[in-house]
């Protein structure tokens, strides 16, 4: 029973994104669908992508949109740092300090941060690892953005990532594959794994919301000529895998595969006793 459950977890969480990767590679990288779609958005007379010249569109979809993942990362980082403060405060030795913290409601914030230290640290690590993976791939494939290439009025050649990939060194100056802005939206998938730890009933809605956010982020850049559509799909695949591989050592497979809570059940942050015997998948002991 445990073996079949484990196999299903890995098949679903690794198998589906890997199947999507194969599909994207065959449908987009092996064809000219990306170029055909971008051609529809390009004005061949003016030699521009019209939406690239709309200042408000750029500000709304590229600059302001970053607030969501940026603030999430900043809140997680602040929470992770605060989580180490409460254990250092000895209210029995310093009752006046303890009283002040209680009156100012700071104590409840510090206790909350301490109780959710693992979650805050996970989000920080997941965001950092996702960013690192995307930056590595950008540097080691050196793909230029459509708007920079000769296909759309630029001066640089159009190249496919698999023709340019270098494992141990940077491949050039191109930094377009996979989609960086899309990956910013997809990194919100980290919150889905936090929700899975607590078996939140709406965790799937959170997952779909993060996927939609990343897709919207990526699509807006496609409309401006700064990415091909496949760049968004690749970003989602890599970010999912990075978040999943980060969540496994933080929370453990046994916890992540548990069914969501029903209305009458109370959430708990710890795995059930009968699942704790699965040592390879047991989460770390810190809170």
Residues covered by each model-derived region:
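N-terminal transmembrane-helix/juxtamembrane module of multi-pass inner/ER membrane proteins
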Residues: 2-103, 141, 168
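Membrane-embedded catalytic cores of phosphoryl/pyrophosphoryl-handling enzymes
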Residues: 4-12, 159-274, 286
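Membrane-interface interhelical connector segments
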Residues: 142-170
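Hydrophobic faces of alpha-helical transmembrane segments in multi-pass integral membrane proteins
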Residues: 16-19, 125, 129, 133, ...
């Amino acid at each position: 029973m445990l073996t079949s459950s484990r196999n299903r977890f890995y098949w679903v969480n690794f198998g589906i994104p890997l199947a999507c990767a194969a599909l994207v590679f065959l449908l987009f990288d092996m064809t000219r669908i990306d170029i055909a779609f971008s051609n529809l958005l390009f004005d061949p007379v003016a030699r521009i992508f019209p939406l690239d010249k709309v200042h408000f569109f750029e500000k709304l979809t590229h600059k302001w949109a970053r607030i969501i993942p940026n603030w999430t990362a900043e809140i997680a980082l602040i929470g992770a740092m605060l989580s180490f403060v409460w254990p250092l405060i000895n209210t029995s030795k310093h009752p006046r300090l303890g009283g002040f913290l209680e009156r100012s409601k700071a104590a409840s914030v510090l206790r909350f941060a301490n109780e959710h230290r693992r979650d805050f640290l996970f989000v920080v690590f997941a965001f950092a690892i996702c960013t690192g993976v995307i930056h590595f791939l950008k540097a080691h494939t050196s793909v230029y953005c459509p708007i920079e290439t000769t296909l759309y009025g630029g001066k640089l050649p159009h190249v496919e990532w698999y023709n340019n990939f270098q494992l141990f060194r940077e491949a050039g100056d191109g930094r377009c594959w996979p989609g960086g802005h899309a990956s910013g939206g997809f990194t919100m998938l980290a919150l889905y794994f936090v929700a899975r730890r607590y078996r939140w009933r709406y965790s799937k809605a959170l997952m779909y919301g993060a996927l939609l956010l990343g897709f919207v982020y990526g699509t807006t850049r496609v409309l401006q000529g700064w990415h091909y559509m496949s760049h968004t799909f690749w970003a989602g695949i890599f970010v999912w895998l990075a978040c999943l591989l980060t969540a496994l050592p933080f929370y453990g497979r046994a916890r992540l595969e548990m069914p969501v809570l029903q209305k009458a059940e109370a959430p708990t942050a710890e795995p059930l006793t009968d699942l704790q015997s699965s040592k390879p998948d047991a989460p770390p002991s810190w809170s």
